[in-house]
Amino acid sequence: MSNSNDNIWNNTEELNELLRIRREKLNILRSMGIEPYGIDRFERTNLSSDIKNDYENFEGKVVTLAGRIMSKRSHGKASFADIQDRDGRIQIYVKYDTVGEKNYEIFKILDIGDIIGVTGEVFKSKTGEITIRVTDFKLLSKSLQILPEKWHGLKDPDLRYRQRYTDLIINPEVKEVFLKRTKIIKAIREFLDNRGFLEVETPILHTIAGGAAARPFITHHNALDIDMYLRIALELHLKRLIVGGLEKVYEMGRVFRNEGMDIRHNPEFTLLELYEAYTDYYGMMELTEQLFAYVAQKVNGITKIVYQGTEIDLTPPWKRITMVDAIKEYVGVDFNEVKTDEEAIEIAKKLNLETKEGMKKGEVIALVFDELVEQHLIQPTFVMDYPVEISPLAKRKHDNPAFTSRFEAFIYGREVANAFSELNDPIDQKERFLEQLKQREAGDEEAHMMDEDFINALEVGMPPTGGLGIGVDRLVMFMTDAYSIRDVILFPTMKPKND
């Protein structure tokens, strides 16, 4: 579709004149006795999709629809227009002889972007297009802005994210992404509910930021006169519920991390966390691959997806490999043979990786993996047995206590899930928190704080438990072939635009 406003976006003077004309039309309509915002309710009989999907049953019938004018073509005493509702566009035909002189003059004044309600008979035009022959119409809302033309005005991603309302109007494929997002979230809930999980809600305001290695947002509670934190994870409250005997719980909600932004990170994002008593990280692996396959089948009708041109097969079982073996496979270094922290640091330096003073062997292993291995994990892969130094809430492996019963799942070189056999030894947990406190005192703002109440909960007794976290936005990215996380969040965080 090409509109008369194609080239105005580079001409401020012309744009301002068109905006002035729209406001002038507002006054003209009011002088004609039309209040452009005066209708509070408009009853529709159908949506555009009803008619377009079942034309044979609607042909010749009178219907009432409402939508936004997206194009308008006048031919003397007859005009065609396309109106867009929730489900798409449909053509309308407005004729002078049918609606009368005054109404036709009003229709001629209307602009692209105005919202109208129409009543008329369904028929097909000479070109075979399904059309409404309008017998009556009402202006429901006058648009005072100029809608950008699809390929010119809204190709700037920054503008699209800032004005998502306009993006949704102009680009139907954007609306499809968010409709699919809703289906994905519904499918996740359905999958977990069917397996006996209980959905719960836990606090967003925390007195202690815990459950993840991340920098929190800080706020102040005036009545209590204390600083509080927007949650960076859901973990510690959900584990308290496992202690309380709920056994299978999950929460899907917003978490907030005061960190950088890129194509995979937004400061506020949707996180799914679930915990199940009497299972371990192997049980979480099975649940993870089943959940991804279920959602793909439910939403896309197939367990294979194409992401950025690469076919990804989500069908279980997924590949499983330890972190140390993955490094050995892709880098050629066997950290099982490395005995000291110093030796590990030297290996990292030879690999041209930047190290920090005092790094432990486990931290070096994680560094090598992050920098040199992740990008190779295209097909779904569980990377298992993470070093204890970077896994303060995961249970140690009994046969190798330097590592934990933890995995992360990777697709297309990106982490999509994180899971543990949860640490339920309160003494070990307290020791790890104390080690994290040392890291905080040394300047690591992402290290865990001490949470005495959580330690107390573990002392009451938590059964063996498997826990899983999935970034819902990243899952949606894969299911919708979205390049950036901003493409799957309706209103992503943006730097304020300077006036």
Curated annotation (Swiss-Prot):
The lineage of its organism: Bacteria, Bacillati, Bacillota, Clostridia, Thermoanaerobacterales. It catalyses: tRNA(Lys) + L-lysine + ATP = L-lysyl-tRNA(Lys) + AMP + diphosphate. One of its GO terms (cellular component) is cytosol. Disulfide bonds: none annotated. Its main location: cytoplasm. It is found in: Cytoplasm. Binds 3 Mg(2+) ions per subunit. This is Lysine--tRNA ligase.
